[in-house]
């Protein structure tokens, strides 16, 4: 039963609009709530983001009552607690708040305070004849199915995924080599069963778009009213001897079994590990394995890791962080081949570079990019794939030229309207983007005719320190402005094209990325000239109007 809990050292609800306070709850060990004032009304919510637990008092609060996590871009509506943007899945809790007798109280239960969240409840029985069929089992699927049920959809929802398990936190595969399904899964299977969501282990083979049916490799056929394609990406093998899947202990990293196989090969650690590719997957898994006391070398083609995306100066910061963790680098390098071990010719023993360098290897991990997983659509006369194998969509992620079909995540090329985008087609391989696209499609299905809600792409990475990034450089960038102390890996990097800031990256500077994303949504981000004159984006007020 709900009761009143007194807030420590709070005597009134006198606050300014936009103000946030994290306060302790008397009599509840570890109990905290967040007080916020929006549009002359004080709200009381749980104090931490439901994604990874970031303190929301350090987040960004907008005039209309949107609270954004300082770490990974999750957004909540402070009036309802509902999730507005990925990657959070559960809402924040809302508490009734009262002021009386010179003190302030929240009305709730002790269990609710300790939970520090509101657990999403989407239990229902399918009662309508509509059928949404989702192909894929990743982040986009997660956003779509939870968004559908959370938005009131009562039709049948079926998910076809070849992975054989419910949606997992795929970001932790490379960041932490998480290989336990009980820890990696966002929800237990019962959660989806209670929501009348059928998850089937199978793989799409072909689609009859006119007949609205999907055929699978097991020989079954599924019909649909609406189809959501969320099949993600397929990691690439290098087409080189020993590196195209033809030697043992050479791995890709995309699935839970991939992580399990890498850990099995690593064994008790102390192994020589060669990582081919100095982009995010390679850097993250290399850093993780070095932390486990393995001898790790990362091979990259550029002068600095992630130079094309992040710029040379920022890439050098990342390299320095990993070198402190014991990682070695071979940059500006080209791989020639991998050769077998002298002890076991079925397994890798070395990686050869084109300059003649040979790196000993007990195992090799390739992180050289992914291709859109759309093999089941090749040769289908009803659809035209882009050159990279993706599907072109409109702003609502509806596939061009098809009725009642949506594409999200790694396989979708959609018009980008963020700064510097101007509607240019872009394909973004970010966890947040896929999940937000799934949420957007769910909203469109639940509310036919509604306009899609725009979002700014966000990603993060674990590189010895936590990287945050928002925006996109689809149109390129011509300068990187670094502020802070880059030598201490504490900085904000502004990626500019002309006067426009098209992307922002930060380390140890929360919540600059979050603030930048909100400024971008409202088209009031500082210009390059303003930044050069010393404008601090944390001091720029957020207008009510969203202009994306």
Outline where the language-model segments fall.
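N-terminal pre-ligand scaffold of iron-sulfur
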Residues: 1-62, 98-109
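Mid-to-C-terminal Rossmann-like scaffold of FAD/NAD(P)H-dependent oxidoreductases
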Residues: 131-132, 411-514, 518
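Beta1-alpha1 glycine-rich phosphate/pyrophosphate-binding loop at the start
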Residues: 127-198, 280, 287-313, 515
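Short, well-ordered coil/turn residues at beta-beta hairpins
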Residues: 51-52, 58, 230-231, 331, ...
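FAD-site-proximal beta/loop scaffold in flavoenzymes
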Residues: 245-269, 350-352, 357-437, 530-535
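FAD-binding core/adjacent interface of flavoenzyme oxidoreductases
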Residues: 55-56, 70-71, 75-103, 107-133, ...
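A Rossmann-like FAD-binding core segment of flavoenzymes
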Residues: 28-30, 154, 158, 195-215, ...
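C-terminal catalytic lobe of FAD-dependent flavoproteins
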Residues: 45, 349, 355-385, 465-546
